[in-house]
Amino acid sequence: MTVKSIRRAYHVIRTALHYGLDDLLPPKLTPWYFKLLRYCFFWLRNQHKDKVGGERLKLAMQELGPVYIKFGQMLSTRRDLLSDEWAEELAMLQDRVPPFDSAIARESIEKELNAPIERYFNDFDDTPLASASISQVHTATLKSNGAAVVLKVLRPDVEKKVHADLLLMSQAADFLERLLGANNRLRPAEVVEDYRTTIEGELNLKLEALNAIKLRNNFIDSNALYIPYMYEELCFTRLIVMERIDGIPVSDKVALEAQGTNLKLLAERGVELFFTQVFRDNFFHADMHPGNVFVSREHPNDPFYIGLDCGIMGTLTDEDKRYLAENFLAFFNRDYRRIAQLYIESGWVSADTDVGAFEQAVKVVCEPMFNKPLDEISFGHVLLELFRTARRFDMVVQPQLVLLEKTLLYIEGLGRQLYPQLDLWQTAKPFLEQWMAEQVGPKAMAAKVKQQLPYWAEHLPELPELIYDNLKIGRDLSKNQNKLLDRYLKHQQKAHKSNYLLITSAILVICGTILLNQDATLWPSYGSIGIGITLWVLGWRSRPKNRKI
């Protein structure tokens, strides 16, 4: 470790102790000498004993800076690991940092463009439109067509700072993992690795641009979602240029009501958009918090969403989608046995899991939910409780499902904020049933056959040769099996004959020796011994040789 990283580690530990985070660890992890070392090296006591654990963790992460703030925000979505109280505390973390010098921003932009800003842009505004922990946004006008655009540029040296903090987090997680043991529910190393994947994706702005282009193409003719245009030729790893949009933040319900927005339709479209992205396109926006979602000012009676920041996207396999859809349908049919079977069939939990015990655990969690009307049941909450239950049966973490659960909770929260009477089940059920019918019905079978036709057309001419080769192999195998069987039988016959001669010779020699000791007539005793020795020699010589059959 470098001096700089040691200093950073010291600061992180000191901050954690200042907020008494060590008090939140189980007693077996903090023996008497731990407190002694704490006072010797840091001279610190818990300064926030009056605050609950979740609030102390939030304050510590806030003080440690942007990387830890984003980590806290990510943790707030892992409600399969944290209690609701802790998750709600961490959800209040705000990714707001002072802007960096516009001269440095200009320098970074020109380095990516490999040209002066004035070559491509007019009216570049040195005052940033927004500033966050990873990047900063400036406005300008595109010189080529006069379009209003925004330039998003990474903060200077942000990659080094992020990787340095990630290294510390990984080391701390590994240490905690060893302390907590293999059966711990929190799995800190797994959580940090999940965060690493997320934040490293946000450090590559070119990837964000490509994601936005793909999502835009998926909804190019949609009346429900608009994704701003990306100027791909001006997009790089540390800089992207995109169309500037004018919309109302989805969280500003007062402004939406003031312009007469159809909030019921807007809320229902949000749910439909989510399921369309997941089940139709298999490519969904996984960071749809209110700061990334706007509503168009155009035709409020037929409103549509505007989506920003496509740095974090999710995908599911076809199997994941099928199991997920069946899970929801099984839940609303109260078929808990089927839910347990689906988790095992999908490989999310081990094949040797006790299905009956899992079914009962699911029933205990899910059955009370039906005390509420269907329109009040939360899809995200259902998924969350199922994941929490599955974790008790050693569910293998599924990062794509964690992203899905987080996004679903966001979508539900937004939908019910816009229109509290939103019935998610009535909105989603027809979509899920139609998708399932398309996957398992005659049309699905025909589509799969059609999809495989080019493959079979290419390989069909090889079929006669393959059949001939397989028949020949079968015939040769049959011949070889017969030969092996004959050799085995002969080997066994020789072995039996040899064993018979050796046993007989031993009996004759023993009998001859007994007769000789009893002073009997000599010739029978010597004859018995002689024949026995002869048979022993014959038996020994007739033994089958030890070679492979």
From Swiss-Prot:
ATP binds at residues 129-137, 152. Its EC number is 2.7.-.-. One of its GO terms (molecular function) is ATP binding. Its main location: membrane. Keywords: ATP-binding, Cell inner membrane, Cell membrane, Kinase, Membrane, Nucleotide-binding, Transferase, Transmembrane, Transmembrane helix, Ubiquinone biosynthesis. It is found in: Cell inner membrane. One of its GO terms (cellular component) is plasma membrane. It is a multi-pass membrane protein. InterPro entries: ABC1_dom, Kinase-like_dom_sf, UbiB, UbiB_bact, UbiB_kinase. Pfam families: ABC1 (PF03109). It is an enzyme of class 2 (transferase). Pathway: Cofactor biosynthesis; ubiquinone biosynthesis [regulation]. The chain crosses the membrane at residues 498-518, 520-540. The active site is at 287 (proton acceptor). The keyword Transmembrane helix applies. Residues 123-501 form the Protein kinase domain. GO terms for biological process: regulation of ubiquinone biosynthetic process; ubiquinone biosynthetic process. Is probably a protein kinase regulator of UbiI activity which is involved in aerobic coenzyme Q (ubiquinone) biosynthesis. Belongs to the ABC1 family. UbiB subfamily. This is Probable protein kinase UbiB.
